[in-house]
């Protein structure tokens, strides 16, 4: 599809008015859509839309890069890839069979005890919206180069990561938004497991190679302590293979049809721990030039599945960080979503610009 005219935010309108509301039919296809936008200012935007069942954030950015490479030079070296088995068939052996089932059961018991102990807050819908009527909408935010450098520097100083800081800000904002004002918030954080598969999967190979694990954060603690706790917890979950346990759950217990899926979706709706999510793929090395094309940014965002209400999709490229918030309209009204995004960004900027405190002062 081609769109001509409009200002520099025409891409946002296309996403909110067309691309997010119009689902991709996985049974009949096509499985990929593109929109080429030529703005009044002479700039061009390329939207690449792929369903999450076959692509994650890294995959869709890779596809966009390949698309532009072919557009700039149709005679370019052809891209080839092997036909890979499903991700669950590439799991390390210790996460399959009886051992894999035992690992999943152990993690499930641990997480149930954690949730029972802390009663963490979730994103509670302002209005009930039936699954069939749900529509995702987008709020775009970003950090400029100076803010990104400051964030990276302060994260290192406090012994955490950029992802830890971004996720802490989102969890704290969600706590402010919650009527109960809980001391703990449950938030999902995806883990990319391409490198751990057998054999490993390259970033340019199409597929979904992430699994979202739940983390419970004590948001009553100082900001940088929350960020470190996220980093530590996520690192430990990766070491224990919790992301593969989730793949085991999906492979062994996922419903085979919509009728069978209803009870599972109802459970996730009522009690699922990851209806708030922070998905960060980090720095994506998108080129600044492809042939005669000069590129200014590359970013991704996500529509929301049946178990989510508010999601932050994050990556950096071309010296900036892109923070795309998506939410379920009406369940999270627009004004509420704007407040959440504003609080999230404000919390982060306050933390990275605050005077440096010693570790002793933080305790």
Task: Give a label for each model feature.
Residues 8-32, 175-363:
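Acyl-thioester-dependent acyl-group transfer interface
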Residues 15-16, 46-50, 59-71, 147-155, ...:
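Structural preference for long, well-ordered alpha-helical segments in enzyme cores
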Residues 28-47, 127-195, 320-324:
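Gly/Ser/Thr-rich phosphate-binding loops and adjoining beta-strand/alpha-helix segments
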